[in-house]
């Protein structure tokens, strides 16, 4: 299950008698064509507010399976950066053989087409690489506020790791925000 507030404290309104924060998911519709939303996404007529429509959303709670068995669960808040952060983590575990915490900790970059800039985390690339990319015409933006990714790997701390015991879960929590904690058993 996943839920979005969209922005810190959502719409900044709570449901009467419950204290449950209401989201501001309406920001994911195009309120005014060509004007960026909270996350800098510039949207058009196709995402205009209209009856019966669903807002554009990047929510991506992800379960990775192999041979019908769950091997990894990963998710994060972060608006337009969600898909990028989830994909980076999956690639780091599956293709680069990182353990789940290394995969979550690894530097990330994000490109969303509009605005035309690639946001790169500090220390993700060397100053020389930055200079080369900018010399090729790439626009490198400053890092955006961090996602707070969490991931669980089932069976071993990495896909290449040797399973220890039965039904072990290895959790990883993103150090970019000082919130939450992941534990495994």
Regions found by a protein language model. Give the residues of each.
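Proteins synthesized as precursors that undergo proteolytic processing into mature forms
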Residues: 1-144
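In a subset of proteins, long, contiguous C-terminal domains/tails are tracked
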Residues: 94, 127-185
């Amino acid at each position: 299950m996943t839920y979005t507030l969209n922005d810190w404290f959502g719409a900044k309104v709570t449901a009467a008698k419950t204290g449950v924060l209401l989201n501001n998911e309406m920001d994911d519709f195009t309120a005014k064509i060509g004007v960026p939303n909270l996350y800098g996404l510039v949207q058009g007529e196709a995402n205009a507010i209209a009856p019966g429509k669903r807002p554009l959303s990047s929510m991506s709670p992800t379960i990775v399976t192999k041979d019908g068995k769950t091997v990894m669960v990963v998710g994060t808040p972060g608006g337009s950066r969600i898909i990028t952060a989830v994909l980076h983590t999956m690639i780091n575990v599956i293709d680069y053989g990182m353990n789940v915490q290394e995969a979550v900790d690894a530097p990330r970059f994000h490109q969303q087409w509009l605005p035309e800039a690639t946001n790169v985390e500090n220390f993700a690339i060397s100053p020389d690489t930055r200079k080369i990319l900018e010399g090729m015409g790439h626009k490198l933006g400053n890092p955006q506020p961090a996602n707070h990714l969490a991931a669980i790997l089932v069976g071993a701390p990495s896909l290449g790791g040797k399973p220890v015991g039965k039904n072990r879960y290895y959790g990883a929590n993103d150090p970019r925000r000082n919130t939450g904690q992941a534990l495994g058993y």
